[in-house]
From Swiss-Prot:
Tissue: Expressed by the venom duct.
Name used for this protein in its record: Conotoxin Cl6.16
Subcellular location, record wording: Secreted
Entry coiled-coil feature ranges: none
Record GO cellular component, one term: extracellular region
GO molecular function per UniProt: toxin activity
Domain notes: The presence of a 'disulfide through disulfide knot' structurally defines this protein as a knottin.
Signal sequence region: none
Organism: Californiconus californicus
Keyword line: Disulfide bond, Knottin, Neurotoxin, Secreted, Toxin
Disulphide bonds in the chain: C10-C22, C16-C27, C21-C34
Main location: secreted
Length: 35
């Protein structure tokens, strides 16, 4: 089960706080960064 930030839909990691990974349209909570 992936820890999604359900309130933060994204199209890429640039949409996520702290440059976190974007997976399946949602930001991952427990990812330090995503290149």
């Amino acid at each position: 089960q992936w820890p999604f930030q359900q309130w933060a839909p994204c199209t890429g990691h640039w949409d996520c706080p702290g440059d976190r990974c974007c997976f399946a349209g949602y930001c991952l909570e427990t990812t330090p960064s995503c290149d």
